Amino acid sequence: AANNNSNNSNNSNSNGNDDDAINVWTDYAILPQACVTYNSNDVIVYSMYAQQSRHCTDSAIGTYAAAVPTFVNAYLDQLQNNANDSHVDFTYPEMAAYLDCTYRQVNGKDYYLQVGCADDGSQALAVNIYEDGQCTKASTWNGYDDANVPVDLSIEFRKCTPCVIWTDKNDDEIDDGYYDYKMTNAPLCRTSWEYRQSCDAKCQMLAREVKARDGWNQADQILLSILTLFGESITK
């Protein structure tokens, strides 16, 4: 894992090409591929497709990267949107508390936490530990920087997902603007498109590599004993 400082700039600077704006998302799909460290930043690599009916088997519009907090925030917005549409409750995971760089004190020492990539492979998220308030300088123990925070959110990597997810509705449940709203309000795809960054050959190669780091279990046990983030030693 690495820093997520690019998230701050991503939230204020989108791709910026109005000619590429997409207003109706009905035909599009997104395929999250991996969570990797690229150019010293933790990013989600994903491909976008213009014909969702082909289930991401055709040529992609492109393969891009977005800062992990940016992508995860959009992913959660999409889950909330889906839940609202199905009239079910949605509870945000504990990890959502660390979308921004968040201060914690452990055994009298200052740390900062933020969602990023896990150390044990490219298909998982983690809450990472940093030494500075911008979450740019990783704080490691035996080479690992994942904190002991419950990982209660998983991205469905390598799964083709339509940008617009329809649910069965009775005519009495919807008004005239429902379909227009659904077609234009696709939180995950809209945000991923707006804040997309270039993912070159090196970036795409990293996304194809799924390698677990040897010795993770031992390092994890050390972290569990050192960073008890929900123990009495924590001062918020």
For every predicted segment, state its role.
Residues 1-236:
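Mature extracellular/luminal domains of secreted and GPI-anchored eukaryotic proteins, especially small
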